[in-house]
Amino acid sequence: MYRRENINFSHPPQLKSPPPMSSPLDSNRSYRWTSLTAANNSKFADTPVKETPQKPDMSWWSPSRGDTWRLNAPRGRTLDLVAAFDQCSRQDQLDSPRYANLGRYRRNSEPMQDNEKEVVTTNFIDDSMIEDHEEYEEHDIELGTDFYDPHMIRHHRSSERFEQSLGTGQQIETIHISTRLVPQLKRVPNSDYANDGRGDMKEYGSISKKNETPILDGTPKRPSPLTTRNIHKVDINRMDHLMKTENTVAGFITLTPQVSKVTHKSDFSKHFGQEESVRASPMSRRNRRGTQTIVLPSFDSPASVRKSIPSPGLPTKTDIRSPSSLVKSIANDFEKADFGFHRKIDAAEEIAQLRKRADNSTFDENQNMVSDSAEDNVSNDFVPRISHLEMHPSVHMGISGYAKKNHVPYGESNEEVLYSLPIKKQSRNVDREGMDQTDEILLTPRAITMRQSLPFSDIPEERTCDKIDEMFDFVEVPTGDYDDKTTLERTVDGYAEVKSQKSPNKMIRNRLDLSTNTYQEIEFEKDTTPYMQEFEEDGTGYSASSSGPQFTRSPTLVTPHAGQSVAEYRVSDKEGCAKTEKVVVQKMSQPSALATSTPKGTFAWRNKNQSNAADDSFVSSISNFSAADKINDSKRQISKLIETIEKTRKHIQLAEISLIDAKRAQMVVQELASQRVLLICRERLKLQLDEVRRLQALSVVRHPPPPINRHFKSAMVISNIAIHLNKNFNCRGSFAFIVALKCRTEIEATGVVTLLAHYQTRMHVIHFGEHMHFSNLPVDFVIAMEVYMMRVPEYKAPEKTCAAVLAAKFRNLLVPNSAHRRARNNSVLSNRTVLSMPGYQAPDCDFRFCGKLTLDRDSAGDRQFYLDDVTYPLEGTVKLQSHCSSLPEAIDVEYRGFLYLFDERSPNGEAAWDRYWAMLHRGIIFFWKNPIDEKNQKVPLSQIDLTKCTNQSVEETRNGRDHEFHIELLIDQTPSLLEKRRVVLAAESSDHLASWLNAINDTLFVLRS
């Protein structure tokens, strides 16, 4: 009969395997068998092992290695960690008594069960151990539980009970049944209970019942009472054989999972590291992969943090101390230990040592660098000991690099990031929330510079690791250049979109806070809340994809201008010569219908009794130019344009003559070049004539818009244009293509690309490699891209018959100077063409328009767009790269809110105020019906271009509606027509009015200052 005895100890028993910290990484472990493991295990004593002690590689403690340690076996750098783990395991076996590895916890005060004598896997825990030890208080072991997840607590009392139950003459070693060496037993792979005795009861039952456990079943089962009752039926000889088969070796926790299918004892080394890739692994194993990271703690953390994570050492047998004193002593040892984090490093000396070590080094079976020099023959006892608690992750080492992350509690975000992409820092402002002292130290410029100054690319170990990283799709980046973990989203066309990985808590919308949010943000939140809720419930949201083709029609072109017309300035259609003929300007009288366009009192109406002397001698406070200076400046611009127009006309005539000669000589290359020059010159002439008309109309305006600041002049470079052809196009007839880019009076074109060289192959894309640069562009510039196409003429070769050859020779004999006379006739023809002789007919350009596209500032980047007005053989999509200069930050801000727009065209014939959603961005106010239209990227209903504003400043209108103001605009509807408009607006409240006036006036000040 089993009898309980009370044995009192003078000191609390030693805790050989303290319970770990609560972490998601405790749910999955695997063990790696190396040569050191076989040498330290008594059952593998016959394995030949090299007993020469070696000095550990101190480079893995160096700050140049980064902030974390990687323990992935195939990736290297694990020799020293393996030595440390072997030492911990060897010391545990030497110091620990012989006891049974039992699988049940209960207190001494717990009443025994009726069948307690038969259950040999009951582990007794003294009450003092639980009450005095802070680790047990933290984990809160409940009474009466048959199953406990943390590591087993082993002490002398449990082993003595088990020895007494078996008899005095029997000596039992550590019980550990390994199904890897028993062919008839099935084993659960990657289980936490495979090597610490928690799955022993299940394996006992499998012996008697001969049942097979599925291989993919990774969830251990609790021992059932039926299984425990059948234990005594197992043959004792069979049990002794199983118990002596393999001993438990703790501490070998790596990233390499165990191999479930091993049939012979000699096959352990063959199956090491045989793990499938991340992409090929199933989701269940991929989820476990996120918990198989072992990272050492930071030794620079505050004392409070180190106290909460104790690290027990390896005490001797005779000195048994209490858990509290043991933890304190180990904490003191770690404080005094020098791990090389604070020592000063000489970059040159460090590189020299690493290169010397690389030249004299070899690689072991784990691809780790091993040095055989005599000075490295040092015992492994000098390796700092690493306990189980220190192996819990306090620094998350992932594939995103060496950036240190704060510990995220389990359950907050357990989503795994399989791929990571480094992102450059955009600012120096680092979020200090949730960072300890170690984080601040690691982000110092000195440490960043130190890590960047060590070129490790020429070391064999690093080259091997880089190859392994490429195989496993790992990314390793320096700490100083990159920050923040990101995920890589793979798109259809091969491009990637970077998205930040954020915590779910940060995605929650914060409540309105008057102390942190501005008035504009608060009002925007209030105004858009009902629309956003309706939009989310409706589910009709639309988000444009950045990878697919998009329409880039600029809203400044298709959006009508807001306001009512007040006056018009039109230029006559008579062009003539600007130097001699006077330009006729007609100022249209204001119609009677427009008299009531603005029923409220305007600024001019309030000051009609004042003198008009200021208007006659108008001086702008922005440009400091008088009206006379402006007129002279406009005249100089017009005369300069007229001279340019004359040169363009001469170029057109030369291109026409060259085209006629190329067609007569049947020279295809010269004909294509002449067609290109003729197309460019004719398009440039149209743009120059339109600009002359615009300047002539602008010269008679009394109050033109003030000039824009020269710092807002932009530049844009467009390159790598690729036009897609129709899929049914098979190049039966050869075509030539050209792309023209137009802005104001300038036009640039690419070279002619023909399909003659690719006549036998089928083409789908036409590439243009030119880089076209535009400078001195306005804030709201728009570049029009047009695609032209022509069919390449195919001339037949002259017949070389005998009659033709004889006729040519006879002709040359009779007329020996025919070639000279033909050249003289060509020169006369060219002179007569220049003099515009009667009967001369200019040839037509064979290039035909087949698609267009509008580009603005928002279309910069590597993008793909749709073409408008597409004709065969184009498919309708174009891909290009564009780079645009940035605007000052003051003009690039956005301001949003609701505004009332006055409109007299109401159905009842009365003036009406319509409520619109307005946005001020880059000097233009856009209007939508509601915020949802803006979010869906719809075309605005109307716009106000502040660069065309003639107001010196926008102020509140007196004697009108509450919170009313107006803006005067000068708009060029056509090149020969300028229209003056007045836009009457009103805000919802006085605060809204003040905010809008400040935003508009600040924009005007920045544009004109």
UniProtKB/Swiss-Prot annotation:
Q: Name one GO biological process term.
A: syncytium formation
Ranges of residues in domain PH: 892-1005
Region (Disordered) location: 1-29, 272-295, 539-558
Q: Domain of life here? A: Eukaryota
The record's Gene Ontology cellular component field reads: actomyosin contractile ring; cytoplasm
Expression by tissue, per the entry, reads: Localizes to the surface of the rachis.
> Compositional bias (Polar residues) at which positions?
542-557
Q: Which residues form a coiled coil?
A: 626-657
Q: Which Gene3D superfamilies match?
A: Pleckstrin-homology domain (PH domain)/Phosphotyrosine-binding domain (PTB)
What are the entry keywords?
Coiled coil, Developmental protein, Differentiation, Oogenesis
Q: Which InterPro entries match?
A: AHD (IPR012966), Cytokinesis/Rho-signaling (IPR051364), PH-like_dom_sf (IPR011993), PH_Anillin (IPR037840), PH_domain (IPR001849)
Q: What does this protein do?
A: Required to maintain the structure of the rachis, the central cytoplasmic core of the syncytial adult gonad. Failure to maintain the rachis leads to premature dissociation of oocytes and thereby impedes oogenesis.
| This protein's name | Anillin-like protein 2
Query: Where does this protein come from, organism-wise?
Result: Caenorhabditis elegans
Which gene name does the record give?
ani-2
